[in-house]
Amino acid sequence: MKKVIDCLKENNPVIQKKLREVSVEEGMEIARELFEILSERKDGIGLAANQIGYDAAVAVVNVREPLILINPVIKEQWDEIDYYEGCLSYPKKGVHTKRYKNVVIHTEQEESDWYFSGTEISTEGKGTWEEQNKKQDQELRILESVCVQHEIDHLNGISCIDKAVDTTIRRTEKKWGRNEIVGITDGKDYKEIKYKKAKPLLDSGKWEIYIGGPIT
């Protein structure tokens, strides 16, 4: 079985290449291998063919359900959001990016388009449990939408490293209460603590406010 090529240590000649289109049959075969690698690693939610050295426009996503993307094309995207994501090809190199909450794509093996949306879905339920459940569902939908965009970028020779944005100004705009719970990350670990306890870590430059995102 092939492995994900660590681009920080090894050369990957196809990681920055726009990949060739493939037949559905070839795409399905590659997708099976990609899912096997994800299943064995257990540390990713998406994978593109060029991450393991194949010149083939095929990727898989597994957030809410397993999805296969063969020669995918983004047709529409809207509602830009800030995100924080990582990549199996660039371990421990999380970056802030700009993504879209909603995206419509077309894949080779399906006649109809696929619509991924992080827009909150209204429910009849009320109360703490219902609100938490609704929030978790929305977060998963956004994660799935971003992961799809991340993998399609890979197939066009673009990684999240290429899309990294400077967040210096954005971070200073937000004022946090001393007792407000914030999520912070050092690119590897994640923790939720009160801002007054997080501030020394943030000031050290080794930790930053976590926006949330996939490692794919």
Region locations from a protein language model:
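Positively charged
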Residues: 1-181, 185-192, 196-206, 211-216
